[in-house]
Structures are given as C-alpha cells and as structure tokens.
Amino acid sequence: MIREETVFGPIFSRRLGSSLGINLLPEKGKICNFDCIYCECGWNRDGRNDMVLPTAEKVRTDLERMLKKLAAEGTPVDSITFSGDGEPTLNPEFPRIIDDTLRLRDQYYPQAKVSVLSNATRVHLPEVFNALRKVDNPIMKIDAPTNELVAKINMPAPGYDLQRVIEALKRFEGNFVLQTCMLRTENGERRVESGERGSELVFDSSSPEVVGPMMDIVRLLKPREWMVYTIDRATPMQGLVKFSPQEMKALVQPIIDEGVTTVQIKGAVEDEN
C-alpha cells in the first residue's frame, strides 16, 4: 500500500495505538534498500515512479498543519510514526526532520511518542544514530539471524552486513525496540512473476536455523522490548503463511521465561520481566 501524502492518518496501529504517519520517501512511490518478500508496499521495482524526496521544510509544514488541525478537533495521537514507503533514514535530511518533529510534538501533543520504523541498515552512520537516540521509540528490524537468511526474507541492497547492524545496535545500550516479522513460505516454494530475482525460496521463522540464533541476538542486544508480529496484509510474494499469536508466543517463550526483555506479540504485550 503506497502512501499518497507525506503526513497521513492518524490510523490505528496494533502496536502503537493512534498513529500519525510521516512518509519521508516519494509520494506515490517507494525507495528502500530492502526488498522484503512481505512488504505491503510491494516490490521495489513497482514503486519508483517519483524519485523526489520530501524536504525537511515540506515535512515540517505538512506536519504542523496536520497537528494544528487534529489538536483543534480533539483527535488523540499516541504516536508520530516515521514509516511510509520504504526506509525513512534514506532521506538525507532525516536528522533535521527528527529535530523539527520533536519540537512540534512538544508544542501540540507533548504526551505523544515519536517512533521510527527502520531496517537498521544505516544505524552505523553517526548522524543517523544520533537522531534515532533522540526519539522515544527507535524500532529497529532484524527478521533473520544470518546474512544468508536475511537475503531470503529481506533481499537487501548489496553491502548489507548483519554483524555491522548488530554492532551498531549495541550502542543503544538496550534503549530501543527490536522488531521481527515471523512467517513461512508455503511448501517451500517462491511463487512470483517470471523474471523476479531467484526462482525458489524456503524460509520458516520457526525453523531451528532461525529461532535459536534469533533469540541469541535478543539476549546479546537486550532491547527494552522485542516486537514480534506476522503478516497482516497482502504481500508481493504469494504463498506466505502467517503465524498465529499462539505459535509466536511458543517460539519466544524462552526469552519471556528468562526475563530478558518485554515481548510484544501482535499487539498483545506479554510483560514477563
């Protein structure tokens, strides 16, 4: 689902409540350095109609106009959320936009959280890390525990290195949210149009090669929360199978039992600290 505006919503988020979205990528387009098999925005190749990124000035103007309107109407906002059509930290003015957003949040909705949904590929950059440290909810994605498995589910741009991501996330010292999508491919088949990258893909978040090493990453990083969810909308790859909340809880139960972190499962918090 491609966003058609820079500031959109608010919409109800199963994870964040009443969420006002900010899209730092092109309106009616998509730019991302991941090409996830489950992305609701579709494949990267289908979304590059407009390569013009919104400027910090446009984001500030659009956001202030929306916040004024919502405040006057008495509309609740729980989170101002950077998501949208791709990876928000790819916008070169991301640090300035974060500063502007925090100022406007404090002015109009001081109780709201500022959240950033990111694939964590640029956290190693000082300017990106410093900006993310300022927000309430830096929500960083790791879906799989090895470069080979990340290549299957996220199909990152060349140069991705999971170990570099992990080392960068350590700098948060636990003050971030780790996000993981759980799914499996149906019958181990990748059903896509002719010409798409690869011809077959087998991935299962419940397999030993995924679930055990993923929990080791959680133990290492000790995020303040592990947000575990599954697919909820149409996906560009056909034949993906969602997990039930019960399946996901069973998979992460060791982390809950150990009290490593709070685990949120598809919006239902299992607070077992």
Annotated model-derived regions:
Residues 244-273:
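Binuclear metal-ion centers of metallo-dependent hydrolases, dominated by the metallo-beta-lactamase
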